[in-house]
């Protein structure tokens, strides 16, 4: 029995695919994060950040959680705030879906809609800057700061990555995940490079995002993308970087719902395409884990709305053969992601990143140096 809903975070299932996997190809497995109580992988990092802040004294009873998020992380914090008795203030933007707004507010959180775009045409920097300003002005406020706080990736290093290896006995040949704030991909890739060095790590982004460099353009796929390479992600830990078009990401997610009975968001559809690409190249002795970060129920008004899909010029048909053909034609954006960094120096100063974030990052840097001097077996038990 769990004493609170928060005790049910983690230990999500690893699912094989009944119809997509073929005996002559590598096996694709989905790490299905929809089973977290807040409905996404973001529950893990949100809880870790909040509980670390409580332990450090950065967040005290009756305090306020303030975060910039257009979706899952805001929902997770709203749930955690309700369970722990904190006021929660989430900064969103006009692209935030009605479903996500309803979930955030359903947990009792307050919402501020930021309408000013930043220098890249998105809302990330303006949302973050305002969240940091409010955190300074509101007494007892704490900013989890998923974009710049390296505790985000540490949460996945300590939980998600370990679960994957425990649930996947034998060889793990590849791991595929989407990238935005870099927490899940950053933490899991760092762990796997030590404890499953044979695994190829693939990062997946949207066409139009510049995390892996390239030309910035508008994109529709939620849950991916930034206009810079996030601090949480070390690109040299990746073996491949892929950029997937909006239409392909949406069509793939619809196909898995209709033909495998697995609901997922578009960013997870993009990851599944990359996993399938690898499976087609390899034989049956190989195993690929692809992250499904949330469920598709958050995208009923877009992903599963034929009228909306047609308004975007997207196909509404989604057969498994279509998906297999899309995957077959994919090519990596880069086979040397470490050379693709789009680092924007001075962002921490420009956006006035909170002192608690800087302290957490400094402490984690020291801990990483100590961890690096220990044997892998000893460090694994840390």
Q: What does each model-identified segment do?
A:
Residues 1-382:
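PLP-dependent amino-acid enzyme catalytic core
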């Amino acid at each position: 029995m769990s004493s609170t809903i928060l005790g049910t975070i983690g230990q999500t299932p690893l699912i094989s695919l009944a119809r997509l996997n073929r005996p002559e190809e590598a096996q694709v497995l989905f790490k299905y994060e929809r089973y977290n109580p807040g409905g996404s992988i973001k529950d893990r990092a949100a809880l870790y950040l909040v509980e670390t802040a409580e332990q450090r004294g950065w967040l005290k009873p009756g305090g306020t959680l303030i975060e910039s998020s257009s979706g899952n992380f805001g929902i997770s914090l709203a749930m955690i705030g309700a369970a722990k008795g904190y006021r929660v203030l989430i900064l969103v933007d006009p692209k935030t879906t009605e479903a996500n707004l309803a979930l955030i507010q359903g947990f009792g959180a307050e919402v501020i809609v930021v309408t000013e775009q930043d220098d890249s045409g998105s809302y990330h920097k303006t949302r973050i800057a305002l969240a940091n300003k409010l955190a300074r002005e509101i007494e007892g406020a704490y900013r989890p700061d998923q974009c710049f706080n390296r505790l985000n990736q540490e949460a996945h290093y300590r939980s998600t990555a370990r679960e994957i290896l425990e649930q996947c006995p034998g060889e793990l040949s590849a791991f595929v995940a989407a990238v935005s704030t870099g927490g899940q991909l950053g933490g899991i890739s760092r762990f796997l490079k030590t404890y499953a060095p044979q695994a190829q790590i693939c990062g997946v982004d949207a066409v139009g995002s510049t995390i892996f460099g390239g030309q910035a353009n508008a994109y529709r796929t939620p849950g991916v993308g930034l206009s810079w390479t996030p601090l949480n992600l070390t690109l040299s830990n990746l073996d491949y970087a892929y950029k997937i078009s909006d239409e392909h990401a949406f069509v793939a997610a619809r196909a898995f719902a209709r033909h495998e009975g697995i609901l997922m968001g578009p960013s997870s559809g993009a990851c599944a395409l990359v996993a399938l690409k690898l499976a087609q190249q390899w034989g049956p002795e190989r195993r690929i884990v692809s992250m499904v970060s949330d469920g598709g129920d958050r995208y009923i008004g877009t992903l599963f709305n034929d009228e909306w899909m047609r308004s975007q010029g997207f196909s509404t048909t989604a057969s498994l053969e279509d998906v297999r053909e899309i995957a077959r034609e994919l090519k990596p954006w880069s086979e040397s992601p470490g050379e693709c960094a789009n680092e924007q120096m001075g962002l921490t100063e420009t956006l006035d990143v909170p002192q608690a974030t800087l302290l957490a990052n400094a402490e984690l840097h020291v801990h990483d140096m100590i961890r690096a001097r220990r044997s892998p077996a000893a460090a694994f038990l840390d």
